[in-house]
């Protein structure tokens, strides 16, 4: 079909010539049956959900258990981000750097254009306008996703400010990021569809200079909801580098002292390391409270007062289900229980509820994430996929900070870097200054999780928890962080801390109880900001003793806390060649400032007896 004969092209609710021309071009290439413009309304959402139920993609859950909620089971080959198929196609290979897959942009466009040709046949091309961050921000970051997946349209309504209001912001000539997505599963006339269409060939491609995203073959979250990692981190990090701000893989937490003073903390952890749990923290120390601003992504800019302000560009939570329960994260459970949730790849109970590993109560019988019968103590496989998800509106979170949607953002007092390490890294360490903090973030390591492909359990370097999400060269990224610090008075900058909730004893036990008790560790960080707490200078930074932490009412072995805080010089000396190897991998663009910090660490460790 030509553009003239594709229904929906001539009834567009916009006069934006660039947008109209792009939609027309994509429609002619992909050959959908029709074009539809998503308006983000409740009526549209309900209509699409009903259609997805009819198609077998969604199963409606028991409204008494999970109101207005649905379960989707993906194709078993389409369950996580596909880092091996994710590309940063900058004009020059050096600008993608050693951590990214690169291909010449012209070559990639050629390959993907061939894949897109006719890829939407038998389907609807949805035009999905969206805004990352508050619509009334001074510089709203806008985008339009073209997709042939109704699952994506429904999820984008939850995860972004999507629809007519975003289209209005784009106006008749506004800039927007072009995000093109196709599941790559055309339907011939009369051909039956499958519940989760996708393609064995997958590409998730970013063109940083032109601010474009092209995704093909996957219907799964991070590969298909292009406002999430693709825009909010990969493209936004390139924008932030050019414009002098930070786009980071961080939660934003509001911690409130008994004196009613608020401290905003941004924290970077690799996927599945407790980011959402910390974002929805329930402090166990009397008088302390916490509220949630965001659980995954923080965009940080300097305010007029010289402080760093953060906004959460997202509109919902796309959380990992396994391990989430009423004990580990009651606020996430309350958010989900409010309804309006799309679950992907969790198990279904016989009474139409959902279940996953770690959730209270083990049902005798389930339908697992592959649609098969699962019997307690008989079935050996997991009922829910380790990377199964819930997609739910942020507005339902009972601990949501009232200012979460403030276009100015919230002033950040502390930045935490943390990963999952069994040894070496203490419970908390304070960086000596901003540049030392950048070094800590640059050397962050974590054990591999199920949220990405790869062998679970091996430690990989994950700088600032951004390894899979950098839109440009990692060395330039480190230098950008150092430069950000030079833009401000050191006294105005957030203090930087390094945390590790996951240290284990020789017998394999966790040394620290974690979860709500982490508020005790954050209290020390806040008291360091206020110059009220002591700490011990060590070769790796300033570390509290057990006496510096508020452990009142905590049933924990004092020796365990001492061990959790211990700086073992031998373990750190063993870490040095691993850091050296990582920096060699980063290559020629490793900043001098980072090399200086590394040399200083080596010297301090050598001086220890």
Swiss-Prot record:
Its EC number is 4.1.1.32. Mn(2+) binds at residues 229, 249, 296. Pathway: Carbohydrate biosynthesis; gluconeogenesis. It holds the Pfam family PEPCK_GTP. InterPro entries: PEP_carboxykin_GTP_CS, PEP_carboxykinase_C, PEP_carboxykinase_GTP, PEP_carboxykinase_GTP_C, PEP_carboxykinase_GTP_N, PEP_carboxykinase_N. Keywords: Cytoplasm, Decarboxylase, Gluconeogenesis, GTP-binding, Lyase, Manganese, Metal-binding, Nucleotide-binding. The keyword Cell inner membrane does not apply. One of its GO terms (molecular function) is phosphoenolpyruvate carboxykinase (GTP) activity. It is found in: Cytoplasm. One of its GO terms (biological process) is oxaloacetate metabolic process. GTP binds at residues 272-277, 389, 420, 515-518. Substrate binds at residues 81, 220-222, 271, 387-389. Its main location: cytoplasm. GO terms for cellular component: cytosol. The active site is at 273. It catalyses: oxaloacetate + GTP = phosphoenolpyruvate + GDP + CO2. Its cofactor is Mn(2+). Binds 1 Mn(2+) ion per subunit. CDD domains: PEPCK_GTP (cd00819). It is an enzyme of class 4 (lyase). Catalyzes the conversion of oxaloacetate (OAA) to phosphoenolpyruvate (PEP), the rate-limiting step in the metabolic pathway that produces glucose from lactate and other precursors derived from the citric acid cycle. Belongs to the phosphoenolpyruvate carboxykinase [GTP] family. HAMAP family: PEPCK_GTP. Monomer. This is Phosphoenolpyruvate carboxykinase [GTP]. It comes from Mycolicibacterium gilvum (strain PYR-GCK) (Mycobacterium gilvum (strain PYR-GCK)). The lineage of its organism: Bacteria, Bacillati, Actinomycetota, Actinomycetes, Mycobacteriales.
């Amino acid at each position: 079909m030509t553009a003239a004969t594709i229904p929906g092209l001539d009834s567009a609710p916009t006069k934006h010539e660039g947008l109209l021309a792009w939609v027309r071009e994509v429609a002619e290439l992909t050959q959908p049956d029709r074009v539809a413009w998503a308006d983000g309304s409740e009526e549209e959402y309900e209509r699409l959900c009903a259609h997805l139920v009819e198609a077998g993609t969604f199963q409606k859950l028991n409204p008494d258990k999970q109101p207005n909620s649905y379960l989707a089971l993906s194709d078993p080959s389409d369950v996580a981000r596909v880092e091996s198929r994710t590309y940063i196609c900058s004009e020059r290979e050096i600008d993608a750097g050693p951590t990214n897959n690169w291909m010449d942009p012209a070559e990639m466009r050629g390959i993907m254009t061939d894949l897109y040709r006719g890829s939407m046949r038998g389907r609807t091309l949805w035009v999905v306008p969206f805004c990352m961050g508050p619509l009334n921000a001074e510089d709203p970051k806008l985008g339009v996703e073209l997709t042939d997946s109704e699952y994506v349209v429904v999820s984008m309504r939850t995860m972004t400010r999507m629809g007519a209001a975003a289209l209005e912001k784009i106006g008749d000539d506004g800039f927007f990021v072009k995000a093109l997505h196709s599941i790559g599963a055309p339907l011939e006339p009369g051909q039956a569809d499958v519940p989760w269409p996708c393609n064995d060939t997958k590409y998730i491609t970013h063109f940083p200079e032109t601010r474009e995203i092209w995704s093909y073959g996957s219907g799964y979250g991070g590969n298909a909801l292009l406002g999430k990692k693709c825009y909010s981190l990969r493209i936004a990090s390139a924008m932030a580098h050019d414009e002098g701000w930070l786009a980071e893989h961080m939660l934003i937490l509001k911690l409130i002292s008994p004196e009613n003073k608020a401290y905003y903390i941004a924290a970077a952890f690799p996927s599945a390391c407790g980011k959402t749990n910390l974002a929805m923290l329930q402090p166990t120390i009397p008088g302390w409270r916490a509220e949630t601003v965001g659980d995954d992504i923080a965009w940080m800019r300097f305010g007029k007062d010289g402080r760093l302000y953060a906004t959460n560009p997202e509109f919902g939570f796309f959380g990992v289900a396994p391990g989430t329960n009423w004990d580990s994260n009651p606020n996430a459970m309350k958010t989900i229980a409010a309804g309006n949730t799309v679950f992907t790849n969790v198990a279904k109970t016989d009474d139409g509820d959902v279940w996953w590993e770690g959730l209270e109560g083990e049902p005798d019988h389930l339908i697992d994430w592959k649609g098969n019968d699962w019997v307690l103590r008989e079935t050996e496989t997991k009922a829910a996929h380790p990377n199964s998800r819930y997609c739910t509106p942020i507005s339902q979170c009972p601990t949501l900070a009232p200012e979460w949607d403030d276009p100015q953002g919230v002033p950040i007092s502390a930045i935490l870097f943390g990963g999952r390490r069994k040894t070496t890294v203490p419970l908390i360490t304070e960086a000596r200054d901003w540049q030392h903090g950048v070094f800590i973030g640059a050397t962050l390591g974590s054990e591999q999780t199920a949220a990405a492909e790869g062998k679970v359990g091996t430690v990989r370097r994950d700088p600032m928890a951004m390894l899979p999400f950098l839109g440009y060269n990692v060395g330039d990224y480190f230098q950008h962080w150092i430069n950000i610090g030079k833009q401000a008075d050191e006294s105005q900058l957030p203090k930087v801390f390094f945390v590790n909730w996951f240290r284990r004893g020789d017998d394999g036990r966790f040394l620290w109880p974690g979860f709500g008790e982490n508020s005790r560790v954050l209290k020390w960080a806040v008291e360091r900001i206020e110059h009220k707490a002591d700490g011990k200078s060590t070769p790796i930074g300033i570390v509290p003793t057990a006496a510096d932490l508020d452990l009142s009412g905590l049933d924990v072995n004092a020796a365990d806390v001492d061990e959790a805080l211990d700086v073992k010089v031998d373990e750190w000396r063993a870490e040095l060649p691993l850091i050296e190897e990582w920096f060699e991998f980063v290559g020629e663009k490793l900043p001098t400032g980072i090399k200086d910090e590394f040399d200083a660490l080596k010297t301090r460790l050598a001086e220890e007896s």
